[in-house]
């Protein structure tokens, strides 16, 4: 059989032309290249489209090492990254009910099960007690992938419990907000959480304890209209979208075209809505420093 040898490989006449070497050009072995590239899962940056391994992006706090884009961080990952040491998780005893027997394209309990399977979490808010740089504090984080981080009764229960524990322990409360708003499947019960969380925050403030909100991408609706805008200090991550109604809804209502950076963190900083924009890598130290100043700690 007529065969030719190229680069140590035996090629037969049936070898596709795409696999035949071009004279004068060195080509890496295809299998070695694939093995090197796909030894672990990768994440594509939505901004620069660079492929980054999950290990690398996790080590970098979910900030793209190529373009510095802040990728969305899961709530549990964020709290574990934020705290030096986690003491306890709060509010795990609360579970969602379906008092309205709500059905849209599918029953509410089915949506809940899908969200739990997708995220591995039982609800859209995780609350933990831990310490950062030697200071004990309470922190909450929204899981946006759980029904768009929508606020229902369990989210309200967990937030209120976190605020009450902060008061009891004389510790500051930190909230990482990321939500599409109130959960429509719970109707008025969901809207009531705006009042409940706001009242809990006021009790916290009455005791002189700080409440710091970190606005991550995105924050909208009833969460913006309540707990996300009641902080003593509001920090935003770069390029986070923050608002009540979305840009498209507003444009359709007022029949005007809004300027491009509308509702971006940078635009809101220029207009006095947020106090500062902080890179995620500097966030732990920034919160720690603010807490120390607000609580007159050494």
UniProtKB/Swiss-Prot annotation:
It catalyses: N(6)-carboxybiotinyl-L-lysyl-[protein] + acetyl-CoA = N(6)-biotinyl-L-lysyl-[protein] + malonyl-CoA. Pathway: Lipid metabolism; malonyl-CoA biosynthesis; malonyl-CoA from acetyl-CoA: step 1/1. The keyword Ion transport does not apply. Signal peptide: none annotated. Keywords: ATP-binding, Cytoplasm, Fatty acid biosynthesis, Fatty acid metabolism, Lipid biosynthesis, Lipid metabolism, Metal-binding, Nucleotide-binding, Transferase, Zinc, Zinc-finger. Pfam families: Carboxyl_trans. GO terms for biological process: fatty acid biosynthetic process; malonyl-CoA biosynthetic process. It is found in: Cytoplasm. Residues 1-21 are annotated as: Disordered. The keyword Lipid metabolism applies. Binds 1 zinc ion per subunit. InterPro entries: AcCoA_carboxyl_beta (IPR034733), Acetyl_CoA_COase_Trfase_b_su (IPR000438), ClpP/crotonase-like_dom_sf (IPR029045), COA_CT_N (IPR011762). Its cofactor is Zn(2+). Zn(2+) binds at residues 45, 48, 64, 67. Its EC number is 2.1.3.15. One of its GO terms (cellular component) is acetate CoA-transferase complex. One of its GO terms (molecular function) is zinc ion binding. Residues 41-298 form the CoA carboxyltransferase N-terminal domain. Component of the acetyl coenzyme A carboxylase (ACC) complex. Biotin carboxylase (BC) catalyzes the carboxylation of biotin on its carrier protein (BCCP) and then the CO(2) group is transferred by the transcarboxylase to acetyl-CoA to form malonyl-CoA. Acetyl-CoA carboxylase is a heterohexamer composed of biotin carboxyl carrier protein (AccB), biotin carboxylase (AccC) and two subunits each of ACCase subunit alpha (AccA) and ACCase subunit beta (AccD). PANTHER family: ACETYL-COENZYME A CARBOXYLASE CARBOXYL TRANSFERASE SUBUNIT BETA, CHLOROPLASTIC (PTHR42995:SF5). This is Acetyl-coenzyme A carboxylase carboxyl transferase subunit beta. It comes from Acinetobacter baumannii (strain SDF). The lineage of its organism: Bacteria, Pseudomonadati, Pseudomonadota, Gammaproteobacteria, Moraxellales. The gene is accD.
């Amino acid at each position: 059989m007529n065969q030719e040898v190229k680069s140590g490989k035996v090629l037969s006449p049936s070898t596709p032309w795409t696999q035949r070497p071009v004279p004068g050009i060195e080509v890496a072995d295809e299998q070695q290249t694939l093995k090197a590239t796909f030894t672990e899962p990768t994440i594509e940056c939505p901004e620069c489209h660079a492929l980054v391994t999950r290990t690398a992006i996790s080590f970098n706090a979910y900030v793209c090492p190529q373009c510095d884009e802040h990728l969305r961080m899961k709530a549990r990952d964020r709290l574990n990254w934020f705290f030096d040491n986690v003491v306890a998780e709060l509010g795990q005893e609360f579970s969602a009910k379906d008092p309205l027997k709500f059905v849209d394209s599918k029953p509410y309990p089915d949506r809940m099960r899908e969200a739990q399977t997708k995220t591995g979490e039982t609800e859209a808010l995780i609350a933990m007690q831990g310490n950062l740089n030697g200071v004990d504090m309470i922190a909450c984080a929204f899981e946006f992938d759980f029904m768009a981080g929508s606020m229902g009764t369990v989210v309200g229960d967990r937030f209120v419990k976190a605020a009450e524990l902060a008061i009891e322990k004389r510790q500051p409360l930190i909230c990482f907000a990321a939500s599409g708003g109130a959960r429509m499947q719970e109707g008025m019960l969901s809207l009531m959480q705006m009042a409940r969380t706001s009242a809990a925050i006021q009790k916290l403030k009455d005791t002189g304890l700080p409440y710091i909100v970190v606005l991550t991408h995105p924050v909208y609706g009833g969460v913006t209209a309540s707990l996300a805008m009641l902080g003593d200090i509001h920090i935003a991550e770069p390029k986070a979208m923050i608002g009540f109604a979305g840009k498209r809804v507003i444009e359709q209502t007022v029949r005007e075209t809004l300027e491009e950076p509308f509702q971006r963190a940078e635009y809101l900083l220029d207009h006095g809505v947020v106090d500062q924009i902080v890179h995620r890598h500097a966030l732990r130290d920034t919160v720690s420093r603010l807490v120390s100043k607000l609580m007159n700690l050494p």
